[in-house]
């Protein structure tokens, strides 16, 4: 087998439709577009969501909700992620240094997901009630 001898299987490829090439082709004269009207013209079609002048669905329905801008600067850390930290004292900066949170994060909350094996000291970081109990049980403290 050589690359220059490769060919598709017989009957697997069909020739493209050749429009406007005479009556005998089956797609002559109007090229399958019918007679007149917007869709028969070149460039003639409506934009997505256009309903012929009727008020479109996305404008008939009420607006709802919004995304809080401050939410972008809040992150959650799971308990088991604190096991991987080399530092004993955990602050916002240490979490950023170890790549656990993005650089633009301003507040962090530790949630009780997974287990913590080592004693860590949280400074300036919020945590849930369950996470606080788990950290103190492991010998750490929350400040």
From Swiss-Prot:
UniProt cross-references to PROSITE patterns, sorted A to Z: RIBOSOMAL_L15
UniProt cross-references to Gene3D superfamilies, sorted A to Z: 3.100.10.10
Gene Ontology terms describing biological process: translation
Similarity comment text for this entry: Belongs to the universal ribosomal protein uL15 family.
PANTHER family, per the entry: 50S RIBOSOMAL PROTEIN L15 (PTHR12934), LARGE RIBOSOMAL SUBUNIT PROTEIN UL15M (PTHR12934:SF11)
Pfam families associated with the record: Ribosomal_L27A (PF00828)
Its job: Binds to the 23S rRNA.
Assembly description: Part of the 50S ribosomal subunit.
GO CC annotations on file: cytosolic large ribosomal subunit
Region (Disordered): 1-52
Stretches with biased composition (Gly residues): 21-31
SUPFAM superfamilies for the chain: Ribosomal proteins L15p and L18e
Species of the source: Francisella tularensis subsp. mediasiatica (strain FSC147)
Protein name: Large ribosomal subunit protein uL15
InterPro entries according to UniProt: Ribosomal_uL15, Ribosomal_uL15/eL18, Ribosomal_uL15/eL18_sf, Ribosomal_uL15_bac-type, Ribosomal_uL15_CS
Keywords: Ribonucleoprotein, Ribosomal protein, RNA-binding, rRNA-binding
């Amino acid at each position: 087998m050589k690359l220059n001898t490769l060919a598709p299987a017989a009957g697997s490829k069909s020739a493209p439709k050749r429009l406007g090439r005479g009556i005998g082709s089956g797609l002559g004269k109007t090229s399958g577009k019918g007679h007149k009207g917007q869709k028969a013209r070149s460039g003639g079609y409506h934009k997505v969501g256009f309903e012929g002048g009727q008020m479109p669905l996305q404008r008939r329905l009420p607006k709802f909700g919004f995304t809080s801008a401050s939410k972008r600067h809040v992150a959650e850390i799971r308990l088991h992620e604190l096991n991987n930290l080399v530092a004993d004292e955990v602050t916002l900066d240490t979490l950023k240094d170890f790549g656990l949170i993005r650089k633009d994060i301003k507040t962090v909350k530790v949630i009780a997901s997974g287990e913590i094996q080592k004693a860590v000291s949280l400074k300036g970081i919020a945590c849930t009630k369950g996470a606080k109990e788990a950290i103190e049980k492991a010998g750490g403290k929350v400040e």
